[in-house]
């Protein structure tokens, strides 16, 4: 309830240093995220909503100098200052665990092809480099390797092996069925007489996943989240409202399509999490 300046040094709990003295605040990010979540859930959160912890750069600035910190984190500090009106060079930042993106991804072979012949996967959507949880600051590795080296060679090599083979006719039943399915989905989204914008469903889905399928999970929480996602998915298709038409660029329609995919992905993520009984990287 007090301002930061009113909290004495003796009262401040440097919980990472306390829990992991060998690593301190250099603990791996999944461990640091779980520790922050634990502190917040225990009622020790800070800020107006009591849903964050402090990240104090004073020692780093004192040791390395403001110029070095600005070179490394300047853009981040500017975004934080614009969002909060607080200067992270002068006072600690308020941070909390949040969804980044799905880690790991589709199984693929050495040539980046999935179990579906002809379907390739690149970047962090695959599983070849990082496994279930990559190291910090390594996100571009898979994108660069796949984009510059693997896929430009693997895909032409695969296509060369198809030379002379008949392609699927555009009027084949499989193609017609797939096209009709997509058109039907778009038609439903555009003409559905609902009342709720896609962004609202997106936010509610995030809240469900953050609470039940976040950095720390339990069987009870996952089952509750699965039920909530299924209910939200039904509500989405019943009450979503997309403004505009489908005969020109429509960002609301694009967003609705993505939210529909997110709802399906969320259900799969939770189902998979329930099937895994042991901790594994981002699943804890």
What are these model-derived regions, one by one?
Residues 2-4, 9-26, 31, 35, ...:
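Glycine- and aromatic-enriched mobile tails/lids
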Residues 3, 11-103, 116:
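C-terminal catalytic lobe of FAD-dependent flavoproteins
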């Amino acid at each position: 309830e007090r301002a930061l300046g009113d909290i004495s040094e003796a009262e401040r709990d440097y919980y990472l240093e306390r829990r992991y003295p060998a690593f301190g605040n250099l603990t791996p990010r999944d461990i640091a995220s779980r520790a922050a979540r634990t502190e917040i859930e225990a009622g020790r959160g800070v800020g107006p909503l009591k849903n964050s912890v402090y990240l104090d750069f004073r020692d780093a600035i004192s040791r390395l100098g403001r110029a070095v910190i600005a070179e490394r984190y300047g853009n981040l500090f500017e975004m934080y200052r614009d969002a909060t009106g607080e200067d992270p060079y002068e006072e600690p930042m308020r941070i909390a665990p949040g969804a980044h993106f799905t880690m790991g991804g589709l199984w693929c072979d050495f040539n980046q092809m999935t179990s579906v012949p002809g379907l390739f996967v690149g970047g962090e959507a695959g599983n070849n480099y990082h496994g279930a949880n990559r190291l910090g600051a390594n996100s571009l590795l898979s994108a660069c390797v796949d984009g510059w080296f693997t896929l430009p060679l693997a895909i032409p090599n695969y296509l060369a092996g198809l030379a002379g083979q008949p392609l699927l006719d555009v009027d084949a039943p499989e193609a017609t069925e797939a096209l009709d399915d997509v058109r039907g989905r778009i038609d439903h989204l555009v003409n559905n007489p609902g009342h709720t914008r896609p962004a609202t469903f997106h936010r509610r889905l995030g809240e469900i996943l953050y609470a039940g399928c976040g950095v720390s999970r339990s069987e009870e929480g996952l089952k509750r989240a699965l039920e909530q996602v299924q209910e939200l998915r039904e509500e989405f298709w019943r009450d979503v409202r997309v403004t505009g038409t489908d005969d020109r660029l429509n960002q609301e329609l694009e967003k609705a399509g993505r939210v529909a995919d997110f709802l399906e992905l969320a259900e799969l993520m939770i189902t998979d999490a329930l099937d895994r009984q042991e901790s594994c990287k981002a699943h804890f």
